[in-house]
Design a protein with these regions (language model features):
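Aromatic- and glycine-enriched glycan-recognition loops and surfaces
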Residues: 1-53, 57, 139-149
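Active-site-proximal substrate-binding groove within the catalytic cores of carbohydrate-active enzymes
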Residues: 43-114, 122-273
Length: 273
């Protein structure tokens, strides 16, 4: 778990955050208040955690055209160089392993009577050029949709990221939907065709208001496009993130945002609810 998740061959709680009973109590309490809880995980990728944690590069990672394992790196946004000294590389998983990880996460969520949230399903599609069992992006799309349909048919509540159309039909919630569009085109007006098509069929939000680069624009776009509001919070102070690799969460300090969040939600519900 956490921000550097290992391969999702099993779902274990972080003991510092509480026990299984604590998590179940939280979910039950939320349900009593009409709040849905989703357990989130990454299923397309894995850190090289080693064979003792269930990951073996040569059998579990997808392949490039060169037949090398699909090892991926984070790149520096300023220099465009690999951030090898700061960030550990990670691997794209083979397609059949991705669907196994989806089942593992869904089974864990169902065990707590919670929904399942996929960080990368319905958002990213990848090929696997393994010569003995290649997978095209078209095949991956069809297989992802089939797996999502199976989970949906079994009564599992599903949350996805971004919301590509092949996955939206099976989702109960879409987060981080792009409400802005490309900034590279010179255009006079924007028409939210996608949001017009799905509005009323699935709930969706834009980026977390406290993490986006322009909170006011994201809020106005949410109102215009019929989106819900999203925030990302943590209990600890933002100062805990200083000199770490995760300063993108600097705005996630709950205590710093509490009053403004309530004000935004209250006005949004009163004027648009």
């Amino acid at each position: 778990g956490g921000v550097q998740q290992k391969m999702l061959d099993s779902v274990n709680l972080i003991s510092d955050l509480g026990s299984k009973k604590d998590l179940q109590n939280m979910i039950d309490s939320a349900e009593e208040k009409g709040i849905a809880v989703y357990l989130n995980g990454i299923t397309n990728y894995a850190m090289d955690s080693g064979i003792t944690d269930g990951f073996f590069v040569y059998t579990d990672a997808a392949k490039f055209v060169s037949q090398e394992s699909a090892k991926l790196n984070v790149y520096d946004t300023v220099t465009y160089e690999k951030a090898e000294e700061d960030r550990d590389p990670f691997y794209l998983l083979k397609a059949d392993l991705v669907y196994e990880m989806m089942d593992n996460l869904a089974d864990a969520a169902n065990g707590y009577h919670a929904g399942v949230s996929f960080s990368d399903i319905g958002y990213e599609l990848s090929s696997d050029f393994y010569q003995k069992d290649p997978t095209s992006r078209q095949m991956a799309m069809e297989e992802q949709a089939e797996k999502l349909k199976s989970l949906d048919d079994n009564g599992t509540d599903i949350m996805i990221n971004m919301g590509n159309d092949y996955a939206v039909a099976y989702a109960d919630m879409v987060t981080n939907m792009d409400l802005e569009g490309t900034e590279y085109s010179i255009i006079d007006k924007k028409i939210p065709f996608y949001q017009l098509a799905i509005h009323g069929y699935v709930n969706y939000t834009g980026e977390a208001l406290n993490l986006t680069q322009n909170t006011q624009n994201e809020l106005l776009n949410s109102a215009e496009y019929g989106a819900g509001l999203a925030f990302t919070f943590m209990k600890e102070s933002a100062f805990e993130l200083q000199n770490t690799l995760y300063t993108e969460y600097f705005g996630a300090d709950y205590s710093a945002w509490h009053d403004e969040m309530l004000e935004i939600y209250t006005r949004y519900n009163e004027e648009l609810g």
